[in-house]
């Protein structure tokens, strides 16, 4: 059972558990804390390796929104990385305080961990702040490694806001609407300035410095537009502007103030017509710790239909939209939202009635793909009012490449409806796929609208049918959706939004009683794109049919879906390419991992498209080092020199697969120097684990393996001897021998087959040793962790034929 007394947290080592990785070891004992109090000591030794050591205690307690976790710490040893983590009761979500290259204090020192020092680390919650704790973890992660000790004592949890007494003052007030009413649950409805106040303001004194991450303001009435400055001060004398609003509207406003702390806040209003506040809720740092977290927080305050699904921390799946030449591509998600370019804004449809809106959250949604698997997905909405079909595609070539989206609405009522397509500052790609600019928010700072097009920063959205209404809105107006919710369109046609959260829309009347209306929007990828021809979609489909002329597989009806799925997958491989670079995805994975690329290239070769793999190998070979090292990944920025030792075997396997499928001896011969160089480097790596000290019992399980590497994300923080690398290495040597045979290099072929056979024997011996030593009933993924890695095992058996 987890302990419930935080104050006694460090009293008993038996209530803690040590979890080491690899060769590392750790032990827990009692220690004498400051003032003679009991403490906990962790002694650790990485024994010359990398990895981590975790000390974990299950303990239950709750947290306030703002807190200080205070503990005493001392230690000695190298400057490794120190982590203090809070785990929720599910055990799945973690918040982490991290000190890299932390020099442990030799004497007892107080360490204060604030709520803003514990950002969300990982887990299905996707973000937010911790509220209930189920376990504490203290982690030492090897930097230089080595050995040392760290001791802890005197842990406490404090709420620094408890002693703060808030009070408010204002420039004026009307009867029964005093300044302090904003801070209370007052029936009077908050504070209101006097009607003759020429410069109204309202201010709060928190009674001390308060940490906060934002404000949620409820206004007393729905004034058309509010303008005000929010100012902060530490002493009530010197003020700085924290936020400025010029067109705020609606009954509630959300203001992000990441990392803010202040004693005083003051609202200065532009006029007394809008000078009133019903209530203010101060929000903690997690409210706006990142721009994406801020939108997550805002979405919880509005109806579900106002924001795309992922802002409610729900996964919305998506598929790429592109052409056979790759290069640029859009995304379509399950709800019909279309991202117009990499890290770009999105087009989102709405149906407007006289008084409200219909969105993805109100519709029965169905996803479709042509029966033959061609890459033309489309979405249908069914509602009580109307049916809507959303069909995106890409046409053109080179600099004329353009994204098209056709919307077809059928109004099934006798009433007036409008189809509105909004430009929103959100990607289809969710924030948990964040990488650089990818994922979550796509900032929009300025928009200009006309009946025919919207200029969104430097990008254009044009319509083949003039809109009946158009307009733009800033975030402080709740965006265009704030108007849609009232069945309206915004009236401003040109805006700038310093927050980068501008939105806009075009709307068209949908004829009543079942008649259909359709409109096509165009978003050029480059400057030379033209308006779509009437048969644009049919031409794009014909282009795909010609380009992806797959073999005429004869299969029974039960297997036709499998062939269609293969066609879709092959199409996606082409869509996601960037010139010769084969990339496993359209956004986060726009990088060429040798692993993914040769497997996908081999699939395309089997599908009658051998040039895809051949072009890739020609391009990738340029990045091989002179010593034969094959990089694991290359992207637009160049080579990533991260060590993943599966890359060398994959490179050799890919060249051999190309020869098997297209029989091009001349091409294989042109890469022979690269083949020999990769084999030499592969054997050089293996030789590092064949020295006498690796025959000693403590290291014998590593004998003959490839050295440690970060062959997948799970090993990034602490590289290990990965059997995934080894299986690829064995198969790479076998592939090299096959190439040598085909090219007439018999001595090389014989030698490399021997190398492969001996390598495989050492790998199997190591696996058997780990299984016996750790008492496993599965094939481990690595020597150090003995981890269950079904992907690696399936790859060895299925892809590489080690059965």
Label each PLM-derived region with a short phrase.
Residues 44-124, 145-151, 156, 216-244:
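Extracellular ligand-binding interfaces
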Residues 500-534, 584-586, 634-650, 683-758:
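The feature captures the catalytic groove of carbohydrate-active enzymes
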Residues 487-507, 546-669, 709-711, 721-723, ...:
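Substrate-binding groove/exosite segments of carbohydrate-active enzymes
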Residues 30-34, 41, 158-212, 218-228, ...:
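Disordered, acidic Ser/Thr/Pro-rich linker "stalks" and the adjacent N-terminal cap
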Residues 275-276, 281-557:
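Terminal accessory carbohydrate-recognition/targeting modules of carbohydrate-active enzymes
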Residues 1-23, 156-174:
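Extracellular carbohydrate-recognition regions
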Residues 69-71, 113, 133-141, 168, ...:
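Hydrophobic/aromatic beta-strand segments within beta-rich folds
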Residues 60-61, 119-128, 243-276:
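Beta-sandwich interaction modules
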């Amino acid at each position: 059972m987890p302990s419930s007394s935080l104050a006694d947290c460090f009293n008993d080592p038996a209530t803690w558990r040590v979890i080491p990785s690899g060769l590392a070891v750790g032990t827990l004992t009692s220690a004498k804390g400051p003032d003679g109090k009991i403490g906990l000591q962790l002694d650790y030794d990485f024994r010359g390796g990398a990895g981590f050591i975790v000390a974990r205690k299950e303990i239950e307690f709750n947290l306030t929104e703002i807190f200080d976790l205070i503990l005493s710490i001392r230690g000695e040893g190298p400057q490794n990385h120190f982590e203090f983590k809070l785990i929720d009761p599910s055990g799945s979500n973690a918040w982490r305080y991290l000190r890299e290259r932390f020099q442990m204090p030799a004497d007892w020192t107080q360490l204060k961990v604030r709520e803003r020092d514990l950002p969300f680390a990982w887990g299905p919650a996707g973000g937010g702040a911790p509220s209930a704790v189920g376990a504490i973890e203290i982690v030492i992660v090897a930097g230089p490694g080595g050995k040392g000790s760290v001791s802890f004592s005197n842990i406490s949890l404090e709420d620094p806001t408890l002693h703060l007494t808030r009070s408010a003052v204002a420039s004026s007030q009307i009867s029964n609407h005093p300044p302090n009413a904003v801070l209370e649950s007052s029936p009077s409805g908050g504070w209101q300035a006097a009607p003759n106040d020429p410069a109204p303001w309202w201010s709060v004194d928190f009674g001390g410095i308060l940490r906060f991450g934002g404000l949620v303001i409820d206004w007393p009435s729905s004034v058309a537009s509010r303008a005000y400055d929010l100012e902060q001060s530490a002493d009530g004398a010197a003020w700085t502007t924290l936020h400025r609003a010029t067109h705020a509207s609606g009954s509630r406003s959300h203001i992000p103030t990441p990392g803010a702390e202040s004693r005083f806040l003051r609202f200065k209003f532009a006029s007394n017509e809008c000078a009133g506040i019903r209530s203010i809720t101060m929000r903690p740092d997690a409210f706006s710790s990142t721009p994406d977290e801020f939108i997550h927080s805002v979405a919880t305050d509005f109806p579900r239909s106002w924001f795309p699904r992922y802002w409610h921390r729900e996964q919305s799946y998506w598929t790429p939209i592109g052409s056979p030449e790759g290069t640029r591509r859009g995304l379509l998600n399950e709800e019909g939202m279309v991202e117009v370019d990499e890290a770009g804004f999105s087009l989102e449809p709405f149906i407007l009635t006289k008084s409200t809106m219909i969105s993805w959250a109100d519709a029965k949604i169905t996803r479709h793909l042509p029966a033959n698997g061609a890459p033309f997905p489309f979405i249908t909405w069914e509602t009580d009012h109307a049916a809507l079909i959303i069909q995106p595609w890409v046409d053109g070539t080179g600099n004329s490449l353009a994204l098209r989206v056709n919307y077809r609405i059928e109004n099934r009522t006798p009433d007036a409806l409008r189809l509105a397509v909004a430009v929103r500052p959100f990607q289809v790609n969710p924030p948990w796929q964040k990488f650089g600019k990818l994922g979550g928010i796509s900032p929009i700072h300025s928009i200009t609208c006309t009946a025919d097009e919207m200029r969104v920063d430097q990008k254009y959205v044009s319509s083949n049918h003039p809109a009946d209404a158009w307009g733009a809105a800033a975030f402080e107006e709740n965006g265009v959706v704030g108007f849609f919710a009232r069945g309206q369109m915004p009236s401003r046609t040109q805006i700038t939004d310093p927050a980068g959260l501008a939105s806009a829309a075009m709307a068209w009347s949908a004829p009543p009683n079942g008649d259909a209306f359709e409109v096509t929007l165009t978003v050029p990828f480059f400057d030379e794109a033209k308006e779509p021809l009437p048969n644009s979609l049919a031409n794009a489909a014909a282009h795909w049919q010609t380009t992806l002329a797959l073999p005429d597989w004869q299969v029974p009806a039960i297997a036709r879906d499998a062939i269609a799925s293969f066609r879709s997958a092959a199409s996606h491989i082409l869509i996601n390419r960037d010139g010769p670079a084969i990339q496993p995805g359209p956004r986060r994975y726009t990088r060429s991992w040798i692993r993914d690329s040769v497997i996908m290239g081999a699939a395309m070769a089997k599908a009658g498209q051998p040039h895809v793999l051949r072009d890739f190998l020609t391009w990738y070979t340029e990045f091989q080092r002179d010593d034969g090292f094959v990089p694991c990944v290359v992207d637009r920025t160049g080579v990533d020199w991260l060590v993943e030792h599966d890359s060398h075997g994959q490179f050799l396997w890919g060249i051999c697969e190309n020869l098997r499928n297209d029989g091009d001896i001349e091409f294989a011969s042109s890469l022979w120097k690269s083949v020999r160089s990769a084999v030499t480097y592969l054997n050089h790596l293996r030789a590092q684990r064949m020295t006498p000290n690796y025959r000693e019992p403590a290291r014998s399980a590593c004998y003959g393996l490839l050295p440690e590497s970060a062959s997948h994300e799970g090993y990034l923080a602490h590289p290990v001897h990965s059997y995934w690398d080894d299986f690829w290495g064995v198969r790479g040597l076998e592939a090299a021998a096959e190439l040598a045979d085909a090219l007439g290099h018999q001595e090389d072929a014989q030698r490399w087959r021997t190398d492969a056979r001996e390598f495989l024997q050492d790998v199997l011996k190591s696996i058997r040793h780990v299984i016996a030593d750790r008492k496993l009933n599965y094939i481990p993924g690595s020597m150090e962790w003995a981890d269950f890695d079904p992907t690696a095992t399936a790859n060895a058996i299925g892809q590489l034929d080690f059965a």
